[in-house]
Amino acid sequence: MIRLISLDLDGTLLDPSGAVTPAAKAAIAKARSAGVRVVLNTGRPIPEAFWFAREAGCDSLVCALGGGALADSATGQVIRRWDIPEPSGRQALELCLHRDIELMIFAGDQILMDPFSKRSLLKTYPFPAFHDNGVVTEDPVAYMEEHNLPLTKIHGDQNPGRYPLKELSALPGLQLTSSNDHDFELVAKGVDKGRALALLSMMYGIPLCDCAGVGDSENDLPMLQAVGTPIAMGNAASAVKAAACRIAPSNGEDGVAQAIFSCLSQAAL
């Protein structure tokens, strides 16, 4: 019996234009009216996760930052955050800066960007929830030290040939993943969407075997491997499809709505 559905955001809940469709909202509302929890599990920062959870009509608990944080959109409380250890965090930042990479540096409740990244991200992330918490600084490392900010995640995009992946992989206490075929995400070792979902589901009193997960990317694999009913989107990577028990249509075909309805049919059994 499915009692909780965990949804990835980009490539899953959001359509190709970056919107939550009316069909997706209707499916979420129907699931919640049937007593099934529906939660977001995203690589996006906490403020954006909150915004989309409200926009879609999801339950208040969210997994954000690729499993790096668990928070409550109803209260604004950050329940748990898993930060990158030092000195690996500083070393990783120094490796990534000044390479013409579009960087998002998630530090506390702020998103740090250098001027190069800000220009690019204005086009990539038009959402007010993102830019309201964005800080542009010439020296992110010095800014973090000055304000005593922890580092939770680094996201790099737009210039794969410049990514220092080999050097980052050699740093202790860190792990690399991705949310599409042209980016990278750096988090603390052991941090992933499955681990965060395990804590979230425990808070709701629901075992993982009674949970479903819906996703499309490499960073969704731990979530899909953790739940009893893993569902891949039609636009998912081949490894994600291989980990799923069934495949929904793509995010351009309201696949997430159909995935939710399939869970409701299973929940009624």
Protein language model regions, located:
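Mg2+-dependent phosphoryl-transfer enzymes with acidic/Ser/Thr/Gly-rich catalytic loops
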Residues: 1-4, 20-21, 33, 185-269
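Asp-based phosphoryl-transfer active-site loop
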Residues: 3-17
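Active-site phosphate-binding/coordination module
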Residues: 19-124
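Structural motif corresponding to alpha-helix initiation and N-cap regions
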Residues: 25, 46, 86-89, 137, ...
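Short active-site oxyanion
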Residues: 35-39, 59-60, 152-154, 209-210, ...
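Short, structured coil segments at secondary-structure junctions
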Residues: 56-58, 65-66, 74, 169-172, ...
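Short hydrophobic/aromatic-enriched beta-strand-loop microsegments
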Residues: 59-65, 82, 125, 175-179, ...
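Conserved acidic, metal-coordinating active-site core of Asp-based
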Residues: 95, 99-102, 106-214, 218-223, ...
